[in-house]
Swiss-Prot record:
Descriptive protein name: Putative pterin-4-alpha-carbinolamine dehydratase
InterPro entries, alphabetized: PCD_sf (IPR036428), Pterin_deHydtase (IPR001533)
UniProt xrefs under Pfam families: Pterin_4a
Organism encoding this protein: Mycobacterium tuberculosis (strain ATCC 25618 / H37Rv)
Biological process (GO), any one: tetrahydrobiopterin biosynthetic process
Length: 94
């Protein structure tokens, strides 16, 4: 699995909703209507992550959940991260 170039990541960001690249990581924060809705979102993403064996870092702050994607094994953003970002967009709106 190869790390994507800056140009490849920039191109992919055009098709993603609310994702930003910061410090070599893709990040998206989503504010949910309730704390429990955020927890349910984490569960849904966790199920998908298990299916594809690619796990985001997840931060929960009351109703705001932040998903961070990077392929730690290669030290950068890969196609797996882009695919997971698309999966998260499909779950919670693109």
């Amino acid at each position: 699995m190869a790390v994507l170039t800056d140009e490849q990541v920039d191109a992919a960001l055009h098709d993603l909703n609310g994702w930003q690249r910061a410090g070599g990581v893709l990040r998206r924060s989503i504010k949910f209507p309730t704390f429990m809705a955020g927890i349910d979102a984490v569960r849904r993403v966790a199920e998908r992550a298990e299916e594809v064996n690619h796990h985001p870092d997840i931060d929960i702050r009351w109703r705001t959940v932040t998903f961070a994607l990077v392929t730690h094994a290669v030290g950068g953003i890969t196609e797996n991260d882009i695919a997971m970002a698309h999966d998260i967009d499909a779950m919670f709106g693109a």
